[in-house]
Every structure is written in C-alpha cells, then in structure tokens.
Amino acid sequence: MEKQCSKFIVSGHVQGVGFRYHTSHQGLKLGLTGYAKNLNNGDVEVVACGTPERLEELYLWLQEGPKTASVRQVRRLSSELEHDYQGFEIL
C-alpha cells in the first residue's frame, strides 16, 4: 500500500501535559513514522507517514488525545513526503 503523510495541527490544552510523548507512543504503536512538536501559539504540530488506514486511526486518536489533555480542534492537512522519517520523534 502507498505510503502517505498527513500534517495535523492540534489545538486546546495540549502543551505541558505529555501530549507529544503520548502521540509518539501512539504513532509507533500504529506503525507510523514522523514527529510531534510544540508550536509557539500553544498548538501541537504532528506529521505522520504511513498507510491511509493508520493515518485515519491516528487522526481519530488525536481528537481525544491522552487523558491529561483537552483537545479543542484537530486540523488535518495533506503533506508531501519531504523527509523519510525514522521512528516517531518528539521535537
């Protein structure tokens, strides 16, 4: 199956609550590669690459996030594969 990448912008109370760590763990569990990083405006940017089905599973998970977070919105953008990510990094 073709590998795709998606970029997600997660808004809400998502910084300082372990969101990136849990996202990285979930991404690896789903067999995805990519990263999660904090943005200056308080959002978290997630780029994930893998099969469309696994990306959809991550998208659904991001809408809830870990129990410590309060997700208000998840915006999903398609992303050109700019980098062949190894693992799922926390930036």
From Swiss-Prot:
Which EC class heads this enzyme's classification?
Answer: hydrolase
Q: Which residues form the active site?
A: R20, N38
Catalyses which reaction?
an acyl phosphate + H2O = a carboxylate + phosphate + H(+)
Whether Hydrolase counts among this entry's keywords is yes
Keyword terms: Hydrolase
Coiled coil location = none
What InterPro entries does the record tag this protein with? Acylphosphatase, Acylphosphatase-like_dom, Acylphosphatase-like_dom_sf, Acylphosphatase_CS
> Which stretches make up the Acylphosphatase-like domain?
5-91
What Pfam families does the annotation carry? Acylphosphatase (PF00708)
**Superkingdom in the source lineage:** Bacteria
For this protein, the Enzyme Commission number is 3.6.1.7
For the keyword Amino-acid biosynthesis, the answer is no
Alphabetically, the GO molecular function entries are: acylphosphatase activity
Describe the family membership recorded for this protein in Swiss-Prot or TrEMBL: Belongs to the acylphosphatase family.
Report what the protein is called: Acylphosphatase
Q: Which organism is it from?
A: Vibrio cholerae serotype O1 (strain ATCC 39315 / El Tor Inaba N16961)
